[in-house]
């Protein structure tokens, strides 16, 4: 009797403990950017003290060489453009609506100065605690001789926007801007004289080492330089043409007469070791965001900032860069097994884990546009789909990705692997928004204007599929979600409530239209499936799509992805950190605690049962 009571007590204890553990299981944040928004400029007074400014009145400060960054809150919302310090305590920030801020304590507190203008200020330069200049829209330059307490506009003979200004003494300075404008003054800006820039491209930034040596950069990959402060010559930037034309260069900074770094569009970083005679683009871009500000502390150490809260740091002269911050939007995640996973997103971003998600590292996709779907055939071979007709392939686990869709690459035999019938072409098909593997050899991708592709040989060839030969309208709708149960049975959903189903591997399709805009679908069998979409839409079919029943959902947020473990257990994720769960096939959906308010884009399950979610601001969650 005592033994039976003892085992009863132990069993009760184990049940209570197990229930407590299960009740306590929550989603855990593996990755999430600390910062959001766009960073426009970075400035270091010395190796330890630095500042970053950007959108939403953002000012970040470090006093330990960038190991930690502290946000300096302000009681207003303005987009800041440039920041400059003349010592570790005294600095100025300029931005939209004629905004000028000043600090005397290293940024612990900021005072807003009266400027008498609402012009968007884009550049600022101070040579000491009293003498400074700011420039902006409409050919605007203003000057202060009392540290910013009062400002006086200076007349210049142009209406072109002045993007940057740089003074080396209280008398000698330069300004650069629209239409290749270059201005020079030797009397503190009382008189500005035009200099020939040798380009008609907008010059977005100017950086002078001294009274003679300087560089200006801008649109169309323009780089011009001077060695005497008067005559400017064009330098060949060798900037890539990611979008069919040379990338704009947004900023440039030199450590000395030889070593310089330029920051450009789509994550392009240029370095020179000979004063710009030769510029070398970084082969593997750490990010693909717009890079707007660069500052060199020495010939080896530099910082770059840009869109998507990007902060980059190098200690080897720009050969390699650490990604300190990047708030990219991750759109899809895929695990081939419990250890190997990939997440893809905007600006060509690819994240990879080889340790079950404990650590994620960027991979270079070679693409700079949006990536929406990813899938792997085996540990080495995988595919990514995205905008601009992107179809990328890797044969080495993501170390290198190559396009299999570039018509200009037919000489290498890759473009011929894309086969479309009739009037359809790869380029006219535009973006792909999702992909699904029915098995290791059969995969599907869907996208813009009814685009559907399939492979039945593990990606060796991809064939275009017309799901709407009867012209019901679905063939022109954007398709956002696809899920195949096996190589024969699959579902597609999209704009206008489009639902398409095949039971013969895509040879024929049944189509219905008229539900809310649907973003994703998950099927357990040819009969049982759930679809999810905008404004909290979740619906279920138990008869193969003949009828759909709306399910009650405790949110009106857009639902972006849906996953079912079995016929009863399912999850959805959506905007503003929405996570829903059901344990009864969707009869009831309950809101789960979410560790983020970022939009969540995808959810998947690994073979061992671990769940993964990805979303905006490089959010990665594990359950």
Question: Which residues make up each language-model segment?
Answer:
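Bacterial N-terminal signal peptides that target proteins for export
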Residues: 1-7
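Bacterial N-terminal signal peptides
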Residues: 9-17
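Residue-level hotspots at or immediately adjacent to binding/recognition sites across diverse folds
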Residues: 23-623
């Amino acid at each position: 009797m005592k033994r039976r009571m003892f085992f009863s007590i132990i069993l009760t204890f184990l049940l209570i403990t197990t229930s407590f553990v299960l009740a306590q299981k929550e989603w855990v944040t593996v990755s999430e950017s600390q910062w959001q928004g766009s960073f426009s400029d970075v400035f270091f007074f010395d190796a330890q003290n630095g500042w970053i400014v950007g959108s939403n009145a953002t000012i970040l400060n470090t006093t330990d060489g960038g190991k930690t960054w502290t946000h300096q809150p302000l009681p207003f919302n303005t987009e800041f453009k440039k920041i400059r310090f003349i010592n570790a305590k005294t600095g100025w920030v300029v931005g939209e609506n004629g905004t000028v801020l000043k600090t005397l304590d290293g940024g612990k507190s900021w005072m807003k100065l009266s400027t008498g203008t609402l012009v968007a200020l884009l550049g600022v330069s101070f040579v000491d605690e009293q003498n400074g200049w700011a420039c902006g829209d409409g050919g605007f330059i203003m000057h202060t001789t009392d540290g910013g307490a009062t400002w006086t506009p200076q007349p210049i003979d142009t209406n072109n926007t002045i993007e940057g200004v740089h003074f080396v003494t209280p008398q000698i300075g330069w300004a650069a801007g629209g239409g290749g404008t270059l201005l020079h003054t030797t009397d503190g800006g009382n008189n500005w004289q035009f200099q020939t820039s040798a380009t008609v491209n907008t010059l977005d930034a100017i950086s002078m080492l001294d009274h003679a040596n300087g560089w200006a950069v801008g649109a169309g990959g323009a780089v011009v330089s001077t060695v005497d402060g008067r005559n400017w010559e064009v330098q060949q930037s060798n900037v890539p043409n990611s979008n069919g034309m040379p990338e704009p260069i947004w900023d440039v900074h030199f450590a000395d007469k030889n070593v310089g770094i330029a920051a450009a569009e789509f994550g392009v970083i240029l370095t020179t070791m000979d004063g710009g005679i030769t510029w070398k683009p970084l082969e593997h871009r750490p990010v693909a965001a717009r890079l707007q500000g660069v500052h060199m502390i020495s010939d080896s150490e530099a910082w770059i900032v840009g869109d998507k809260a990007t902060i980059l740091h190098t200690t080897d002269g720009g050969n390699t860069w650490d990604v300190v911050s990047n708030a990219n939007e991750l759109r899809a995640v895929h695990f081939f097994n419990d250890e190997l996973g990939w997440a893809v997103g905007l600006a060509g971003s690819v994240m990879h884990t080889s340790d079950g998600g404990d650590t994620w590292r960027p991979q270079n996709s070679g693409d700079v546009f949006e990536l929406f779907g990813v899938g792997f055939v085996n540990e080495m071979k995988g595919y990514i789909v995205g905008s601009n007709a992107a179809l990328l392939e890797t044969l080495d686990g993501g170390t290198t990705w190559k396009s299999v869709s570039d018509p200009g690459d037919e000489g290498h035999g890759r473009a011929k692997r894309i086969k479309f019938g009739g009037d359809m072409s790869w380029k006219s098909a535009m973006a792909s928004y999702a992909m699904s593997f029915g098995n290791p050899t059969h995969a599907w991708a869907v996208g813009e204007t009814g685009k559907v592709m399939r492979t039945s040989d593990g990606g060796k060839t991809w064939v275009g599929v017309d799901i709407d030969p009867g012209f019901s309208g679905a063939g022109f709708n954007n398709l956002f979600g696809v899920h195949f149960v096996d190589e024969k049975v699959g579902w597609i959903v999209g704009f206008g409530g489009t639902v398409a189903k095949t039971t013969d591997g895509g040879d024929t399709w049944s189509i219905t239209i008229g539900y809310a805009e649907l973003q994703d679908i998950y099927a357990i069998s040819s009969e049982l499936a759930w679809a999810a979409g905008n404004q909290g839409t979740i619906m279920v079919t138990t008869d193969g799509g003949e009828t759909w029943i709306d399910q009650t959902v405790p949110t009106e947020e857009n639902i972006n992805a849906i996953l079912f473990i079995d016929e009863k257990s399912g999850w959805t994720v959506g905007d503003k950190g929405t996570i829903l769960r059901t344990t009864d096939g969707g009869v009831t959906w309950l809101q789960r605690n979410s560790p983020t308010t970022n939009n969540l884009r995808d959810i998947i399950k690994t073979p061992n049962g671990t769940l993964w979610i990805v979303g905006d601001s490089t959010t990665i969650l594990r359950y």
